[in-house]
Amino acid sequence: MTTDIEQTRTDGTTVRDVTYELLRAHGLTTIFGNVGSTEETFLAGFPADFRYVLGLQEASVMAMADGYAQATRRPALVNLHTGAGLGNAMGNLLTAFQNKTPLIVTAGQQTREMLLLEPWLTNVDATMLPRPWVKWAYEPVRAQDVPAAFMRAIATATQPPAGPVFLSLPLDDWGQPCAGPAVVRTVATRVAPDPEQLREFAEVIRHASDPVLIYGAAIARGNGWQQAVALAEALNAPVWAAPSSERAPFPEDHPLYVGGLPFAMGPLSDKLAGHDVALVVGAPVFRYYPYVAGPYLPSGLRLLHISDDPAETGRAPVGDSLVGDAVLSLAGLTDLLASHTPPPAKPHARLPHRMAPHPAMAANGSPDGLLSAAQVFAALNQVRPDHAVLVEESPSNLPDLHTAWPVTEPDTFYTFASGGLGWDLPAAVGIALAERDSGRNRPVIAVIGDGSFQYSVQSIWTAARLRLPMLIVVVQNDEYAILKSFAMLEQAPGVPGLDIPGLDIVSIARGYGCDAARVADLDAFKQAAAAAWTKEVPTVLEIPISAQVPPLV
């Protein structure tokens, strides 16, 4: 469907006018950005019905937009400062791409009149800089092409697999006369699976004696918990979360949920031993991290794979793949298997955590007298509000966190798909803003390591300025514990730069306008955490924990 924004134009209409009308028509009235000289002509005369969310550094800007887009299930608009700003944002652009978040990323470009001379702040080869972490990158040839370029960017970002796109926009384009009204289009955002291949998958599952389901983040992105549960119950089959899943695809208190698969070949294969058919839905096959030798699959297991991302189906090393929407595929398989009588459920060892690289520690004190991560997270679970949203970036403590806090409601857990630190804190700010904008107003809690906290710390200034009453729990072990675990696995002793003593989290947080405190005992921690929701600004709680180096797998 296409509609003209208006049928006639009066003299004086500019590229800026038409572009803002296009953005308005798509509901893209919130812009996450960090202002630079090459963007000022776009932002001049900023419309009253638009909102500019300022971040102090572009990595924070990118991840705030990512969190906001995920939590609203809508694309978000990012405005960066030429090549320098895009460079600052690249780590979180990589994460947004792997999160499959629809972002329209724009950056200003020097004036066309001088581009050949490469003056200061020229983004040389602008469309190459963000690759390969965007679906499409473009610099319009004419100023009058800018609105149409935005329309293509929106369509490309939102079609599956969703992801970021990039536009480089010369600063002198915005005041140019517009060639005509912008055209607003809609595009489908789901791809139905091939019916014949889906029937073939159903027949394989129907004849399985011990099937197993492996669910991934695409189910959560597609709001598909209901469909995921329906298929699992129809098959009476155990459900694993795919390795390192960035969203929770299934209720972790469901009797059929058995935990998160490890993210190494050998251990993952061992977990699937004894099954004859595995169905992977909405995840790659598989997301690995450390190399631990072993087969991709145990002997006798046939793997079926469903993803809306042809890159995932293409690179899968084993199995038969089908390209299609995860949630539509789940519903279709449930219908096809409606008359199926599943085999009796077999006992499966249930793990007390999900997507964790190693077993959880015991929830008791540590030899050095400090609290353990398990104790802190158990206390947090006791005082967290109902329906709280957890945003996590403390990789070495992940199993302890999920032991204490199983994810039992949809859209209440977020983390990164990339493994690159610096996403959680600003993403939590974007999610908290989305919670307020949507009217859900669920409390947002970020759990983050003291090392991770440093990467995009500027984002807490934005949270304070927006008066978002979120809770940020910083567990302080004065080290990069996950890297020590990796070094231990790789038999690489003596690696420098893994200890980070002397960080004053409280002073940093207060300097950015947050309420902050250092708490060293559980009673004080629980009291301060409960009080966070009475504040008008974010609360940052620094809590020392024992420095422990758990095994990686």
Name every feature range the model reports, one short phrase each.
Residues T2-T14, Q144, G180-A182, G300-S394, ...:
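Phosphate/pyrophosphate-binding active-site segments
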Residues A76-V78, L167, L390, F413, ...:
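Well-ordered beta-strand positions enriched in small/hydrophobic/aromatic, beta-favoring residues
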Residues T106, M114-T122, F263, S269, ...:
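Thiamine diphosphate
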